[in-house]
Amino acid sequence: QTAQDDVFLYYPRDTAQTQLEARADADPSVLDRMEASYAAYAASRYTAVPDGYDELQTLCDEAKKDQKLTEAADIGDYIRAYLNTNYQYNASAPQPPEGADPIRYFLTESKQGYSVQFASAAVVMFRMFGLPARYVVGYAAPQSLFTQQEDGSWHAILQDDNAHAWAEVYISGQGWTPMEMTPGVLVSAQQADLRTDPLPETQGQDTAPAAGE
């Protein structure tokens, strides 16, 4: 594999939040209108649930009512615990039969998978809770891959086994927020240690997050 010239800029979430707050202070009406418009778009575009998941919908409805789950973080914790408890990580998980629904196959038959299956199932469940959610594919980059350049920047060459999938939930005022659902991988942006989750070869070493879509 040859190195590519692609450069991905990294903007820490706290930096983005500071910039948004500064813009809101300067002209809150503009930001509010933009936020309201996109929130409406996200709600119309990213909340559809496929047919045939009645039992899972009932599970989510009961959890929302019984545990009073309304915040995205709490809902994420519930979904993560449910998936990590009832399903097994397997980088060599069997593929669904031709023509089968891959998410339903994961949830009801194989009950094992890697980041693709965990993220896909999580997106469906987030939507069942009423939250706009989407499926994202990118990379999880080990810290060891990064080398500092003379200009102070950090570069890394990412390969196929750094590929990773995760769910993102739209939260008003924050935008699309990553929700990691794969067992053994980063849960929140504040956590320093996580493992890569190749698609679908083998899990790797401690890593730092690198996002793509």
Residue spans for each PLM region:
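Gram-positive cell-envelope targeting signals
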Residues: 79, 207-213
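Acidic low-complexity segments
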Residues: 1-109
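Secondary-structure capping and boundary motifs in well-ordered enzyme cores
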Residues: 99, 107-114, 118, 159
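Active-site-proximal helix/loop capping residues that flank conserved catalytic or ligand/cofactor
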Residues: 18-20, 77, 113, 165, ...
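Hydrophobic/aromatic-rich core segments of domains that either
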Residues: 116-206
